[in-house]
Amino acid sequence: MTTRPFVQVFDAQNKVVGKVKLPNVLTTPIRPDLVNFVHTNLNKNARQAYGAAPYAGEQTSAESWGTGRAVARIPRVPGSGTHRSGQGAFGNMCRGGRMYGPNKTWRRWNRKVNVNQKRYAVVSALAASAVPALVMARGHRINGINEVPLVIANESVDTLQKTKAAVELLKKINAYADVTKVIDSKHIRAGAGKARNRRYKVRKGPLVVVSGKTTVSQALRNIPGVEVANVSRLNLLKLAPGGHLGRFIIWTKSAFEQLDSTFGTFAKSSAQKKGYTLPRPMIANADIVRLVNSDEIQAAVRASKVVVKRPTAPVRRSNPLKNLRAMIKLNPAAVSTRRTQVKSLKSKGIKVSKKNQLRAKLVAATFNQ
């Protein structure tokens, strides 16, 4: 999110010729999740319906042989004298059979997106285009650009009619490096699409946004990756191709000044979009650590309690098979068992050692406790 009050305006020679106020739409909250969701749904509206033929995979008079032949009950092609006879048919697991759940032309191809969601996604994409880090993260070559957003004087863009002059302008403002990236990125598509009239894939270049009727689209339409859009009809599919924020945008001065009337401000509704005002950020400063550690908040917060943690004595674990006290804690019946053993030994005339007698006394003392 940018906080600059003004943006410089450059001419065809890349010299500063003025400045223009930064529109509020470029300071709106950036919602990549919403942009991705809206782009995914809007992109589905350009699909063409397709489907499998109604009788594909079922144009044979196959019938099941039934049970008792030790073969599957799938329908089988009749006849003899050919490899095809006796083969399974119709099923999606069979060669030459129909697919499971054949595609139908009455599938729900289009998606409806709420108007406010679409507008929020557009303003988020515009705000992201004013953050150089997001523009560079998307892959655009803007190292030589003087300022982002880049605003060009009207007379330098609106009068363009030839592609040669447009290329010269892009070179003057150091934006042609992004076009070179597009030219170098052309490669053959992976997959079957290369045989379906979409053989090559290329990256996206800069987007030139103008206002009113101009001839600049004729001059720019033959430059790879460069697209032209009208500020009154901005499309999310162009502002965030692939649902990715940070498109490099070249504005004309008139289009840049028209953003406030097109999308409105934080205090004033839009003049073109009925009843629409820009979404406000929930917090003015997104640096939460800085806010929490500020003097104002720390003065109102109680000091944290210092808890002295005293060291605890280590727990002594005794083996109950060797330590009689530990065994008695686990099994009180061990007392009577030990007494019975001692009495049994004495009755048989076996001399009981003093150690066993001491143990017996210890057992009795523990039991009496």
Curated annotation (Swiss-Prot):
One of its GO terms (cellular component) is lipid droplet. GO terms for molecular function: RNA binding; structural constituent of ribosome. Coiled coil: none annotated. Belongs to the universal ribosomal protein uL4 family. The modification N-acetylthreonine is found at T2. Keywords: Acetylation, Ribonucleoprotein, Ribosomal protein. Pfam families: Ribos_L4_asso_C (PF14374), Ribosomal_L4 (PF00573). It comes from Dictyostelium discoideum (Social amoeba). This is Large ribosomal subunit protein uL4. One of its GO terms (biological process) is translation.
